[in-house]
Amino acid sequence: GMGTKKRRGFGRCRVTEWQVWTFDLRQDQERTAWLMFDHTVRDFSAPQSSIVQALGLTLEQTDCRDRLCINATFTLDSPLLIRSGQDEIGLAPDVIHLKSRRAGENAPVPILSGTSLTGVMWHRAERILNTLGQPTAMLKQIFGFVDENKLAEPARASRLVVHEGVIAGKTHDLVQNRVAIDRFTGGAYHGALFSEQPVFGTHETTINVELELRNPKDGEIGLLLLLLKDLWTGDLPVGGGRSIGRGRLQGQQATITQYQRKQSSPQTWTITQGNTLVVSDAESRE
């Protein structure tokens, strides 16, 4: 990824075409040729789809980093609303669901942002640790942190990568008109009518959630599985309007893969939701 918030789904990109020119900077003529080279000319080198082929190298295909990957598919059990900015033309409800452009799509598609998902997971993880009487220092190790004073403790990058999830399949964008409540009288607040446009799911709507925990420890894996369980059962809503029933998901299928340096092949567990919940090889994870 490029830029900031790479571990929250931002900055992901893909190079579709590579061209490589080689200069030996130890030679005077080569250094001059590099300085005078016209980068706009594309005829000297044939384009390649892979940087490995373009450089003429061979790389190990196996990623040996220790990490736990969770790929889960959910459906919308209730409307979902993650606030975004106003529409470009200004003819939109007061609050609309967040959308993003994707390659191959003619129009922006609704998404589940990595920042929104991370926020609810962080707060639920803190509640779980407090309930169990465990120190919350683990949260800093997993989610990272920045000390506002920048003196007490150095900042730490998040080891949990949360990707943006595209809300795929057919959805309905319906506008709901609401009125603000006067907290003093309990009645309608004068002149506070507003409209919202959440995403309503259908039986075809799915959301794919991708999580990756790098250098995981057993306790951190257990905490992440508890968060997955709460998302799966709809006990952990995401987005706004949770107090009026929005943002609840229903788990359908999940694949948990653990990569370890000491093992030649990764371990994989699957979770499926039918009439009963089925977890493959659950004993080994325990």
Annotate the PLM regions.
Residues 1-286:
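Small/polar/charged residue-enriched interaction surfaces, especially the RNA/DNA-contacting tracks
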